[in-house]
Swiss-Prot record:
The keyword RNA-binding does not apply. GO terms for biological process: translation. Pfam families: Ribosomal_L28. Belongs to the bacterial ribosomal protein bL28 family. Keywords: Ribonucleoprotein, Ribosomal protein. Coiled coil: none annotated. This is Large ribosomal subunit protein bL28. GO terms for cellular component: cytosolic large ribosomal subunit. The keyword Ribonucleoprotein applies. GO terms for molecular function: structural constituent of ribosome.
Length: 77
């Protein structure tokens, strides 16, 4: 399964590990993804999403109904 946030679309980024001697090797910066269940009152059921910590804050701010409506408008839910 891809390491992608279902709400924000955050994906792994690519960068460098830099040693004290300034040697560089490739590395990946992974998003902080968590599986979370959200109770959707309007549908009277739980919805399980794989979301980043930034998406959790977005859901707290806008509400799960608003976020799900946005996902459905994009055709992802």
């Amino acid at each position: 399964m891809a390491r992608v946030c279902e709400v924000t679309g955050k994906k792994p980024m690519v960068g460098n590990n830099v040693s004290h001697a300034n040697n560089k090797t490739k590395r990946r910066f992974l998003p902080n993804l968590q599986y979370r269940r959200f109770w959707v009152e309007s549908e009277n059921r739980w919805v399980r999403l794989r979301v980043s910590s930034a998406a959790l804050r977005l859901i707290d701010k806008n509400g799960i109904d608003s976020v799900l409506a946005d996902l459905r408008a994009r055709g992802q839910a």
